[in-house]
Amino acid sequence: MAQISLESIKKIEKYRNTVHKKVHTTYTTFEMDGEKYVQIDTYGHIDRENPEKISQPFQFDRATAEFLVKLLSEEFDLR
């Protein structure tokens, strides 16, 4: 499992984009070493061999959450 590196994240231009299918998603919160984390888990498509297995986990600490809130607010013009 990996966490987002805020030191190296950057915007890139991609010319071939697709919208992915929606999949089952869950989230959990936990604390480790005094720091709170939110983990979002996505699961495979129903036709996968093991659809109950986590496909992609994403972990966010406070700094990452602040970065993503700012990014999404700017990109979607949220107020």
Q: PLM features: what roles do these ranges have?
A:
Residues 6, 30, 58-59, 65:
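Mobile acidic interaction elements
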Residues 3, 39, 56-59:
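Residue-identity detector for glutamine
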Residues 8-11, 26, 57:
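Residue-level preference for alpha-helix termini and adjacent loops
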Residues 9-12, 45, 63-65:
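Generic structural motif
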Residues 21-54:
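A short, structured beta-strand/loop element
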Residues 1-21:
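Negatively charged, low-complexity tracts enriched in Asp/Glu with abundant Ser/Thr
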Residues 1-4, 25, 71-73:
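N-terminal functional modules and adjacent low-complexity/disordered segments of proteins
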Residues 59-79:
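Mixed-charge, Lys/Arg-enriched low-complexity segments
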